[in-house]
């Protein structure tokens, strides 16, 4: 066998090995380790969901989605279930997002996982948003991307001082999905637009002050709060709200500190009220304050395509229902999978970690209206339907 043939054989073998590794991660396994990625327990009249991948900051997998969705639906219909609690194991994270590295690697290996993953993830986001039973998300630790989708659409979101919120998708060539187009434009003023385009991180009580959490509890009291919720007998929504309100009122950490963005809200509202990303950049340049220039520096590092998609996503989402937004975001997700920037962003941030993505196109002015329209185009029979 010649050297060239040997090289071809080795290349094929390596590709085969990569594909098998990816499939191993994504397969709907019956094995214990896959089942234990999420714990589903009935405690009295409460259904408890525990995201259980602490080594991976409870990043969301297709297997987890496929366990949570049917159980959530069952509990919603069960007359003996009065409350649903969702939390993360390990203390560091509620959920750091979807396992996007695996999705990107699968796409590169021609394993079409993304259409299934995003479809089922968004179906779950909608199920959380439409859940008829009180739904309490204990967002302690890192809560980003897919973790936001599992919490923000529910009735109650309880943050602690360890909560770290962000929608950092424009830095990896994506957009703030999982219903970001619904909840972000509904935050005060233009705060949601600012968070979406810059990926700015909010911590602790600021997650509550921004309107993302409904309550704040000191982390040392979180276990007690959960115990008190579990002790409720056939509680009404009002009973649950009362317990949460009591803990919120008693919380002490950062109680007297003002919202971290309070002094900048006027700038945020004026700079981010523009209808194009180019105008937002111009507004920040003209403002010239250290805060504005800092945000300008951040925005200039993001994927130009992602920035334009995101602004339009939020503008359109401001007048849509959650289901309409998720249908739109599914179209965007599939367009991003077909494109360059998502895979390049994952490479630069999560794989090689050189933090130097080479975006294509690299300049905002090269992202045309036609490019944008193609991202938002209907997928016909492949559209997400509820």
UniProtKB/Swiss-Prot annotation:
The modification N6-succinyllysine is found at residues 55, 92, 221, 257, 297, 301, 353, 377. This is 3-hydroxyisobutyryl-CoA hydrolase, mitochondrial. Highly expressed in liver and kidney, also detected in heart, muscle and brain (at protein level). Not detected in lung. It is found in: Mitochondrion. The modification N6-acetyllysine is found at residues 55, 92, 221, 297, 353, 360, 365. The modification Phosphoserine is found at residues 234, 356. The lineage of its organism: Eukaryota, Metazoa, Chordata, Craniata, Vertebrata. Substrate binds at residues 121, 146, 169, 177. It catalyses: 3-hydroxy-2-methylpropanoyl-CoA + H2O = 3-hydroxy-2-methylpropanoate + CoA + H(+). GO terms for molecular function: 3-hydroxyisobutyryl-CoA hydrolase activity. InterPro entries: ClpP/crotonase-like_dom_sf, ECH_dom, HIBYL-CoA-H. GO terms for biological process: branched-chain amino acid catabolic process; valine catabolic process. Residues 1-32 form a transit peptide. It comes from Homo sapiens (Human). Pathway: Amino-acid degradation; L-valine degradation. Keywords: Acetylation, Branched-chain amino acid catabolism, Disease variant, Hydrolase, Mitochondrion, Phosphoprotein, Transit peptide. It is linked to 3-hydroxyisobutryl-CoA hydrolase deficiency: An autosomal recessive inborn error of valine metabolism. It causes severely delayed psychomotor development, neurodegeneration, increased lactic acid, and brain lesions in the basal ganglia. GO terms for cellular component: mitochondrial matrix; mitochondrion. Belongs to the enoyl-CoA hydratase/isomerase family. CDD domains: crotonase-like (cd06558). Its EC number is 3.1.2.4.
